[in-house]
């Protein structure tokens, strides 16, 4: 009887981690407000988990949608003010809790992330300038750790939450003169910042230690540096915690995926694209994408990190790029071959339509934006849509 009891306790203790034992396929929610019905819609598309960033909920719709000034520039969701953390904002937490409850009611699992930490306000909420204070002052490491400890103590038993992603796209490199992995030497750079506030590994150790004082079971997910580039795995150190997953984002070549009507659509996939500060021409196809991801695969091999501890946490391209469907298909194929978890960006994002793949290659209608501004689901008409078909196929459950 005692053995059975111990077995039950062990199963219960590792339930959240057990979610990640098999490959999982998800998406990202980074909307202007809580949109509970999107959980149901995602579930209907076989999306197994949602990576949720609630930071935009702190801002007025006029600022997010109509290019009006930010009436609350010092207001940061949950943390109050990125200048100094003084405790979780109760009103914000109540809103987050209601959203997570809605996710659970609709059968969705959630990885919670944040776009800002103390001393690291999200660039888009910081006059489009990097906030690098956390990479220059250890006191912000400590504030970030206290924030996550406080949040984990409240969410550790929430059944929908299957991961804490400590910070979205960290960028200590920007504070210390490193910005182009195509031309700069990562080893040389890291040796110059190791054991300083710009050492991402130290920040993670500090936060993880704090979380584990109140929550021993919820998996923690950490991003690589320079906006979660695969190449920053070269200096990432595995944490001494078995409940940790390691994540990267994939929008490379950025010169391809970030094209839009304003920039123009110069490149297509597969094709030759100019990359890096020196604008080197490089051919991109499936093999080149796999080569770009090699630092992740090599790092995992060197450190004996299993495939089910690696997450392609964001990937995508502007849906109007020629060859977008093939780009997404090739990445999904690569992730599946490695056995990595993946989450495309994004599903029904309400502040931007560039990666709303259900729209295909069609511009949004006026009715679409009217519904969005009202916080309603826009009408979605069936279109000839190869890119969404790629995602639907990738999301199919393999029995």
For the regions a protein language model found, what residue spans apply to each?
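Glycoside hydrolase catalytic-domain groove-lining segments
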Residues: 197-202, 209, 219-221, 225-318, ...
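Short beta-strand segments enriched in hydrophobic/aromatic residues
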Residues: 54, 114-116, 250, 317, ...
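Acidic, proline-/serine-/threonine-rich low-complexity intrinsically disordered repeat tracts
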Residues: 1-11
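Short, hinge-like loop/turn segments at secondary-structure boundaries
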Residues: 68-70, 128-131, 182, 237-240, ...
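Aromatic-rich peripheral "rim/lid" segments of glycoside hydrolase catalytic domains that contact
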Residues: 322-399
